[in-house]
Amino acid sequence: MMVTTRSELLDVVYHFYPRGVRCTERSNVPPNGSFYDDTEEHRRLVEAANRGRAEYPTWKAMIRRLGDRYGLQNESLHLLAGGGDPAYSARIWLTDETALSFHVSLLGPYYGIHLPGIPEEEPVAREIAREIEATYPGYRPIPAELGNEVVPDVAMDTVLMGEATIYMCLFSVVWTWVDPE
């Protein structure tokens, strides 16, 4: 198995997110200033989301298989509506009040499973990992010590400069929706 490095992940982030450009309305950008939506990086992010829409049936089949066994909520419907999400995302309910989320990046061969920190999560997480790796050969998880690292010079639609993590950039702000207990 290939080892995922910080440098590799930052290269992917910077390929899809412009450094030092705030994500704001065009009317708030000074004349001759950089506008986020006009950058080459943003264009590549939109292209990745377009590929994600085209390849959505693969994701849908995988989450249908998981949904046959677990209470599953697809968090990727925004992508189908034209959103620029960087990953497919879903949530599996472990209890009435606790869920884990998982994400398959559209920006590189990575996935993440965000665990809430309860005993019931381990067998479910293993099954999700097996399903992702069978559906998306070559994809690998991002270790928490790398994924939680803040990318100081990147902003996202709903995340201010200096607050986005590698996980958020490669998966989605949906990553933050599961809080460990």
What name fits each language-model region?
Residues M2-Y136, R140-P141:
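Extended, charge-biased low-complexity segments
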Residues Y136-E181:
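Acidic, proline/glycine-rich low-complexity IDRs
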